Regions:
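C-terminal helical cap(s) of enzyme catalytic domains, especially alpha/beta-barrels
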Residues: 248-269
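Active-site beta-loop-alpha junctions enriched in small/polar residues
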Residues: 12-14, 40-45, 77-79, 128-130, ...
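Active-site acidic/histidine proton-transfer and metal-coordination neighborhood
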Residues: 49-153
Length: 269
């Protein structure tokens, strides 16, 4: 990341980077990288699993607070059922949470976000492909059911688009809730192929559905313009989902530099 010219990073999967805050800060400082936050998937709708998810979230929050990071990026962990129909989730809600599950999930998100605020962190909820908050309607439901003073939105352009949504419209509709941004580009022709073949989400990633910024089909300029219009001043996290050893994307350093060059050009315009 440092070699690519980036200024910050999220934590990544637990143990990907050091879990000791002193060691973590030392290693990041040596590379002149800021710790921005951490992606934390949770299962909160299931009574039998929610307590463990809350504990994991609290551990993540404690590490972020000790390391000086500003944002917890919370997401539903999803399951194989939703992964199998990623991008093809029925609009009628038949493959989604029940009313009771929505209530438990939203209450759990509020609980975690409240603890994050106590530790000095913002919480941004990340709609994610293959999770139960993927479709535009599901994003709206979660925003409606959670406390706006506690829970914001992490706008991930690639995941919103793969789920059938419009990142520009999401940025405008939920402007006051956007607290964090993941910038991805997506190849719509690859998405269409994956959906036509009824591939699960990992299968689509293996096809190379996500591209370096500027090489895909998304209106990233429009998204950034919409964010500017509402005064967004947070981090822009550049991402490109791949599967190691499977994806045709073979040069992560090259792609990371390419994405940064594109973003620098757009922001300077």
């Amino acid at each position: 990341m440092a070699a690519s010219g980036y200024e910050g990073t999220e934590l990544g999967p637990w143990s990907y980077l050091p879990a000791d805050p002193t060691t973590l800060r030392r290693e990041l400082d040596a590379r002149r990288l800021s710790l921005v936050g951490a992606f934390c998937p949770v299962t909160l709708h299931d009574r039998d699993r929610s307590a463990a998810s809350v504990r994991t979230a609290r551990e993540t929050i404690d590490l972020l607070a000790a390391a000086g990071a500003p944002v917890l990026v919370l997401a539903d962990a999803g399951d194989e059922r939703r992964a199998a129909i990623a991008g093809r989730v029925p609009a009628d809600g038949s493959a989604g949470f029940s009313h009771g599950e929505w209530r438990r999930f939203s209450d759990g998100v509020n609980t975690i976000a409240r603890y994050a605020r106590e530790r000095g962190l913002l919480t941004a909820f990340h709609p994610h492909v293959a999770s139960y908050v993927e479709r535009t309607e599901e994003i709206a439901r979660l925003m409606r059911d959670t406390d706006p003073t506690l829970v914001g939105l992490c706008l991930d352009t690639g995941h919103v688009a793969y789920g059938g949504g419009d990142p520009v419209e999401i940025a405008r509709t939920h402007a006051r809730r956007v607290r964090h941004v993941h910038l991805k580009d997506l190849r719509r022709e690859v998405r269409a192929d994956a959906l036509a073949r009824q591939l699960d989400f990992p299968g689509a990633v293996s096809l190379g559905v996500f591209a370096p910024l500027g090489d895909g089909s998304l209106d990233l300029r429009g998204t950034l313009s919409a964010l500017r219009a509402v005064g967004y001043a947070g981090w822009l996290i550049v991402e490109q989902d791949v599967r190691l050893g499977v994806s045709p994307i073979a040069a992560p350093l090259r792609d990371a530099k390419r994405s940064r060059a594109y973003l620098t050009e757009v922001l300077a315009a």
